[in-house]
């Protein structure tokens, strides 16, 4: 069974000046099975970022479906989309995108705080990861000399 299905996905942008329409995605369909790895490749301007923004529920398509684990994410209401992203999606950015004014530990537990996990559970779960980073846990990311990428 596919964990991700994209059916006839379409995205059209309308330019601000002149109202011209630009088709970024046109009837794109594919599926991803559990355990598969997928690479998205293409020329600049070919729609890669548009596709990823739609798959991440950061943008809405003009048409089509995006079904993740059996749920069409296009139909998720605006007030529920943040919780859906937090509970079902993971992002791996090219850059770290961590909060400079937080310690590394604070950055790690932030998703748990946003999910309403109680303090004791947060500590327990974060320690599983933090033990590997013990020597830099309380450093601030703004101090670039002390925290190596």
Regions found by a protein language model. Give the residues of each.
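ABC ATPase NBD coupling module
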Residues: 19-22, 73-90
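Short coil-to-helix segment of the ABC ATPase nucleotide-binding domain corresponding to the Q-loop/switch region
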Residues: 99-110
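The feature captures the beta-strand-to-loop junction immediately N-terminal to the Walker
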Residues: 41-43
